[in-house]
From Swiss-Prot:
Superkingdom as given in the UniProt entry: Viruses
Organism of this sequence: Human papillomavirus 52
Protein function: Minor protein of the capsid that localizes along the inner surface of the virion, within the central cavities beneath the L1 pentamers. Plays a role in capsid stabilization through interaction with the major capsid protein L1. Once the virion enters the host cell, L2 escorts the genomic DNA into the nucleus by promoting escape from the endosomal compartments and traffic through the host Golgi network.
Record PTM text: Highly phosphorylated.
Family per record: Belongs to the papillomaviridae L2 protein family.
Location(s), subcellular: Virion; Host nucleus; Host early endosome; Host Golgi apparatus
GO cellular component, one term: host cell Golgi apparatus
GO molecular function: DNA binding; structural molecule activity
The protein's name in its UniProt record: Minor capsid protein L2
HAMAP family: PPV_L2 (MF_04003)
Residue ranges crossing the lipid bilayer per the database entry: none
Positions of the UniProt region annotated as Disordered: 74-95, 203-224
């Protein structure tokens, strides 16, 4: 059973005690002199200041900073700062913007109307000349009114393209004025723009292979939950209700937590000290969202919880961080020598043909190449030599009859005739004399290039002479 610890109450200040105990006369002995300023230190300063004058040195009960100007010699004057007065001007009148005026004020002035100057001279109507004639020879008097000269004025304005945006220039409206007046005025046109949809090309990249300070956006690496740190208490929960309704382990049947989403963080109100159904969940104020992890061969359901074991006078709560976990099922390791029966992916092809061995009534034996020991006699005008045929000469025998291994297996047919091979060469024969135990190499073979492991001119260990 837990007992509530007595709270520590702060003592009232001297001013608060003086306001309540002065009228009743129950004040402590050190409260009244401190508030009314009648302590020994206050008496010394009060009567000592009558005979001692320190001036503006700033020596007193305050901080020893020497006053605002600091400690300066007595023969000098402290520096004074000169205050400069500026001319007071009336404030600039800000004209308000009406509701129908545009919110963007253009930096280009609008069209300015320029007066044409002096009025155009009036030309009198052509009324002719007044001619007066007389009988005597007197000169004629002609009244001619002087006609003023017509004036031509040209006014133009130029814009600096550096400070103006490109715009569509439209012809100005015709001016109704007398005389010849040439003028130009800037025109303001509204900008038309087109909204072009932009596409963001997002490619996934590995965070370990990033070579620039601004990596390509993509999938971020998985952050560690920090469930098994030294500052986190590990608590194993056996009750399976921890996965479906964890609020039942923290509080008793409370309708406030009936419709709470258990996949998110659950906050509990701990304004009152109430016992928990499970003592492991005592003083829990928050259960964070769950996480499924695998550790040491098991599937684990985890939640982080915050406790409010202590609470300060300012209202701050202090508690431990607890990791609650529930092992769902173990992960069985796979056997090393486990035999897995495999099934064929494609159906086995069944041949529609069968071989009946009983139909074979003729058996073909393996043919052996015959070797004939027939003497071959060569006659020359000097000697007669007898050389056996099987001493290095190949003799091929081809049978004249056709051989088949069975009724269903045809063999290629062989020619029935025997090729003609002459026994004796048609070229003129030459006498060969074999005697002695050595040989003489022909001089033409000395200039041949030596080849590796090839000796075409070695016949025997006897001398050969033609």
């Amino acid at each position: 059973m837990r007992y509530r610890r007595s709270t520590r109450h702060k003592r009232a200040s001297a001013t608060q005690l003086y306001q309540t105990c002065k009228a009743s006369g129950t004040c402590p002995p050190d409260v009244i002199p401190k508030v009314e300023g009648t302590t020994i230190a206050d008496q010394l300063l009060k009567y000592g200041s009558l005979g001692v004058f320190f001036g503006g040195l700033g020596i007193g009960t305050g901080a020893g900073s020497g006053g605002r100007a600091g400690y300066v010699p007595l023969s000098t004057r402290p520096p004074t700062s000169s205050i400069t007065t500026s001319t007071i001007r009336p404030p600039v009148t800000v004209e308000p913007i009406g509701p129908l005026e545009p919110s963007i004020v253009s930096m280009i002035e609008e069209t300015t109307f320029i007066e044409s100057g002096a009025p155009a001279p009036s030309i009198p109507s052509a009324t002719g000349f007044d001619v007066t004639t007389s009988a005597n020879n007197t000169p004629a008097i002609i009244n001619v009114t002087s006609i003023g000269e017509s004036s031509v004025q040209s006014v133009s304005t130029h814009l600096n393209p550096t400070f103006t945006e490109p715009s569509i220039i439209q012809p100005p409206a015709p001016a109704e004025a007398s005389g010849h007046v040439l003028f130009s005025s800037p025109t303001i046109s509204t900008h038309t723009y087109e909204e072009i949809p932009m596409d963001t090309f997002v490619t996934s990249t590995d965070s370990s292979s990033v070579t620039s300070s601004t990596p390509i956006p993509g999938s971020r690496p998985t952050t560690r939950l920090g469930l098994y740190s030294r500052a986190t208490q590990q608590v194993k929960v056996v009750d399976p209700a921890f996965m479906s309704s964890p609020q039942k382990l923290v509080t008793y049947n409370n309708p406030v937590f009936e419709g709470v989403d258990t996949d998110e963080t659950i906050i509990f109100d701990r304004s009152q000290l109430l016992p928990a159904p499970d003592p492991d969940f005592l003083d829990i104020i928050a259960l964070h969202r769950p996480a499924l992890t695998s550790r040491r061969g098991t599937v684990r359901f985890s939640r982080l919880g915050n406790k409010a074991t202590l609470r300060t006078r300012s209202g701050k709560q202090i508690g431990a961080r607890v990791h609650y976990y529930h092992d769902i099922s173990p992960i069985q390791p796979a056997e090393v020598q486990e035999d897995i029966e495999l099934q064929p992916l494609l159906p086995q092809s069944v041949s529609p043909y069968t071989i009946n061995d009983g139909l074979y009534d003729v058996y073909a034996d393996s043919l052996q190449q015959p070797t004939f020991h027939l003497p071959s006699t060569l006659s020359t005008h000097n000697n007669t030599f007898t050389v056996p045929i099987n001493s290095g000469i190949d003799f091929v025998y081809q049978p004249t009859m056709s051989i088949e291994s069975g009724p269903d297996i045809p063999l290629p047919s062989l020619p029935t005739h025997t090729p003609f091979v002459p026994i004796a060469p048609t070229a003129p024969s030459t006498s060969i004399i074999v005697d002695g135990t050595d040989f003489i190499l022909h001089p033409s073979y000395f200039l041949l290039r030596r080849r590796r492991k090839r000796f075409p001119y070695f016949f025997t260990d006897v001398r050969v002479a033609a």
